[in-house]
Amino acid sequence: MSSFSYEPYYSTSYKRRYVETPRVHISSVRSGYSTARSAYSSYSAPVSSSLSVRRSYSSSSGSLMPSLESLDLSQVAAISNDLKSIRTQEKAQLQDLNDRFASFIERVHELEQQNKVLEAELLVLRQKHSEPSRFRALYEQEIRDLRLAAEDATNEKQALQGEREGLEETLRNLQARYEEEVLSREDAEGRLMEARKGADEAALARAELEKRIDSLMDEIAFLKKVHEEEIAELQAQIQYAQISVEMDVSSKPDLSAALKDIRAQYEKLAAKNMQNAEEWFKSRFTVLTESAAKNTDAVRAAKDEVSESRRLLKAKTLEIEACRGMNEALEKQLQELEDKQNADISAMQDTINKLENELRTTKSEMARYLKEYQDLLNVKMALDIEIAAYRKLLEGEETRLSFTSVGSLTTGYTQSSQVFGRSAYGGLQTSSYLMSARSFPSYYTSHVQEEQIEVEETIEAAKAEEAKDEPPSEGEAEEEEKEKEEAEAEAEAEAEAEAEEEEGAQEEEAAKEDAEEAKEEEGGEGEEAEETKEAEEEEKKDEGAGEEQATKKKD
């Protein structure tokens, strides 16, 4: 794995600033190695693993070179910080561009709509400007129609005048006929006087029939009253059933229309029957009065008719009873339907409550799973960092052992220069490898942190939805605040622990690299002092960057 394996993720300015710098530094180091002293001797003093011992040794002996790996580490930290800032800036720019693009699209749609409206208005205006040329033809056509109507009116007037003359002639004829009718009326009045005498004789027989008819009419009135009361009761029951259905059953089948239709049909039937009965009784009454003057056989016929009317009345009474039974059956059916719908509504309400409870349970489980997922991510990130640290330790130990074996075999200026060149080349490879190994955990750590932020946002959204669905009480609000504070404290502690682990790993790596370089380097005291100062400054920068990352995580 080379140090430039993540070049697709770096910008051009980043490559120019950070990636090309190690190449120049390594070439300068090689030139320094070429001008070093001719004799090569291995350093037999024990190597310390701390950074303070490295600094004291480099300042006292003056023969150690600056740590390439510490420079690479500072560069990787700066690269990770720049990458984070660049990614945040690019994300903000993309969001801004997306918002602007959406607003531009909306504006284009609005302008298209306005363009269509303006085109329609322009078409209407053009049609209006082209219409005056047709007005003249319309007016001329209307004038011709009016002239024809005037001619028709003149002809109609002449016809009406002729008709008037004919009506005047008819009036004169009717006046003559009226005079003749007056004479015939006088003759009829004489005959009427004679008929009145016969009418007086028939009045006695008529009185008896009238008494009988009065009794029958009283009976008819009584039956009519009973019938009207029963109809009123049926109407009241139907109206009460309709009102109760309209008030209580809003979402039930519309039976009110059916009840109204049934009520209207029976009202029409009852009115028709009453009208038919009245007309029939009136006609029979006139027939009886006329027949009473002639003979008593008509009285018997009247009795038969009365019995027939009674029979008809009984039949109508039976029909009313049947209607009443039908009404009761409909009311019973309506009540059963109401009970059934009430049961369905209660069952649906229970189902809704059950689904709401399941939704709350699912939301709480989802929040719990998200929290567990966040904890697992934190544990995974810590384990990955620890594994990377152990891997770096093992690689550094292997490199140190390989350099020790090579140093024991070198004797003389030629062999020392060859070994020195190989060690420099090996140091270059090791530095490039360690740089890639460091850049990968930093990139992975940033990726994991982004996933952690997304998980936290999802948890907060779920909690916000739960808070909207169920307003929390005071105790729950306090518990939530405590949980938030605890989560923030845990996040801060984890961030501090991660920063400390990273710093410890960096120090261990720097110490190992210093030990390896102490075995390989002897010359260049002034250059080493300057590079040591630069390494110290870069380490301070790394520490400041680690503190900034910790503060950002805390925020």
Curated annotation (Swiss-Prot):
Put simply, this protein is called Neurofilament light polypeptide
Bias type Acidic residues, positions: 472-540
The gene from which this protein is expressed is NEFL
Q: Where is this region: Linker 1?
A: 126-138
The entry lists its GO molecular-function terms as: identical protein binding; protein-macromolecule adaptor activity; structural constituent of cytoskeleton; structural constituent of postsynaptic intermediate filament cytoskeleton; tubulin binding
Q: Which Gene3D superfamilies match?
A: 1.20.5.170, Single helix bin (1.20.5.500), Vasodilator-stimulated phosphoprotein (1.20.5.1160)
* Phosphothreonine modification, residue list: 532
Bias class Basic and acidic residues marks the residues at: 541-555
Tell me, in a sentence or two, what this protein's role is.
Neurofilaments usually contain three intermediate filament proteins: NEFL, NEFM, and NEFH which are involved in the maintenance of neuronal caliber. May additionally cooperate with the neuronal intermediate filament proteins PRPH and INA to form neuronal filamentous networks.
Query: Annotated region Linker 12: where?
Result: 235-253
Domains: entry comment: The extra mass and high charge density that distinguish the neurofilament proteins from all other intermediate filament proteins are due to the tailpiece extensions. This region may form a charged scaffolding structure suitable for interaction with other neuronal components or ions.
Q: Which SUPFAM superfamilies match?
A: Intermediate filament protein, coiled coil region (SSF64593)
Sites of Phosphoserine modification: 56, 67, 103, 473
Any Pfam family from its record, for instance, is Filament
- What is the originating organism of this protein? Bos taurus (Bovine)
Chain residue ranges for the region called Tail, subdomain A: 398-444
Omega-N-methylarginine PTM positions read 23, 30
Q: What else is known?
A: NF-L is the most abundant of the three neurofilament proteins and, like the other nonepithelial intermediate filament proteins, it can form homomeric 10-nm filaments.
Q: Which InterPro entries does the annotation name? A: IF_conserved (IPR018039), IF_rod_dom (IPR039008), Intermed_filament_DNA-bd (IPR006821), Intermediate_filament (IPR050405)
